[in-house]
Amino acid sequence: MAHAAQVGLQDATSPIMEELITFHDHALMIIFLICFLVLYALFLTLTTKLTSTNISDAQEMETIWTILPAIILVLIALPSLRILYMTDEINDPSFTIKSIGHQWYWTYEYTDYGGLIFNSYMLPPLFLEPGDLRLLDVDNRVVLPVEAPVRMMITSQDVLHSWAVPTLGLKTDAIPGRLNQTTFTATRPGVYYGQCSEICGANHSFMPIVLELIPLKIFEMGPVFAL
């Protein structure tokens, strides 16, 4: 989960998030290299005393600074496309959960368990217990198993929302009249937090998402025992 004054990304809890962190580091390394080369060229330009007013032809140099950026773009695009296709891949999910965005709360439906439906509201400050997180904890958590592919079906009943849990590498828009889907496989148990990531009105900041990930054997005893 996130920590106060955190600079980097949250720890990965799914294979997709691990890939995203790796791609982030890969792209950042290329960006730092480009910045270093540009600053070095500027430094040489400002410090050298040699000047020339003659226009010279440099076909080799022009070829290099045309091909080199193309190679850099390919090095960034290929892993990016790979992750993009991974996020769209649906691998025979074991469970399906439907999430419906409202102003300003979420409704969840366990479609594999008799259509169990419940609402999830942010806990007001007066109802917070010791250890609860302000603006992040909810009255009803979504309980899901680890080490099992889960499919989220996401939509909205009023305006645009976005269902996002950073530690799982998930962010899917909730669009009225449209049903989007995403899958994930959590790799470790715990409680993980997210929020609506699409400005949806005055109380946009008060739409937290809380996932409680538990071992599969415990989940099979009753998927909503923690509610």
From Swiss-Prot:
Q: What is its EC number?
A: 7.1.1.9
Q: Which SUPFAM superfamilies match?
A: Cupredoxins, Cytochrome c oxidase subunit II-like, transmembrane region
Any one Gene Ontology MF annotation carried by this entry is: cytochrome-c oxidase activity
Q: Acetylation: is it a keyword of this entry?
A: no
Q: How does it sit in the membrane?
A: Multi-pass membrane protein
For Cu cation A1, which residues are the binding ones? H161, C196, C200, M207
Topology feature Mitochondrial matrix, residues: 46-59
Q: Chief subcellular site?
A: mitochondrion
Q: Where in the cell is it found?
A: Mitochondrion inner membrane
Q: Where does Cu cation A2 bind?
A: C196, E198, C200, H204
Residues that, per the record, bind Mg(2+): E198
Which processes are annotated in GO (biological process)? ATP synthesis coupled electron transport
Any keyword Protease?
Answer: no
What InterPro entries would the database entry show? CcO_II, CcO_II-like_C, CcO_II_C, Copper_CuA, Cupredoxin, Cyt_c_oxidase_su2, Cyt_c_oxidase_su2_TM_dom, Cyt_c_oxidase_su2_TM_sf
Give a GO cellular-component term.
Answer: mitochondrial inner membrane
Give the catalysed reaction(s), semicolon-separated: 4 Fe(II)-[cytochrome c] + O2 + 8 H(+)(in) = 4 Fe(III)-[cytochrome c] + 2 H2O + 4 H(+)(out)
**Cofactor binding mode and count:** Binds a dinuclear copper A center per subunit.
Q: What class of enzyme is it?
A: translocase
Show the Pfam families listed in the entry. COX2, COX2_TM
List the Mitochondrial intermembrane topological domains. Answer: 1-14, 88-227
- Keywords, comma-separated and alphabetical: Copper, Electron transport, Magnesium, Membrane, Metal-binding, Mitochondrion, Mitochondrion inner membrane, Respiratory chain, Translocase, Transmembrane, Transmembrane helix, Transport
**Subunit structure, as described in the record:** Component of the cytochrome c oxidase (complex IV, CIV), a multisubunit enzyme composed of 14 subunits. The complex is composed of a catalytic core of 3 subunits MT-CO1, MT-CO2 and MT-CO3, encoded in the mitochondrial DNA, and 11 supernumerary subunits COX4I, COX5A, COX5B, COX6A, COX6B, COX6C, COX7A, COX7B, COX7C, COX8 and NDUFA4, which are encoded in the nuclear genome.
Q: Which PANTHER family match?
A: CYTOCHROME C OXIDASE SUBUNIT 2, CYTOCHROME C OXIDASE, SUBUNIT II
Q: What family is it from?
A: Belongs to the cytochrome c oxidase subunit 2 family.
Record-given protein name: Cytochrome c oxidase subunit 2
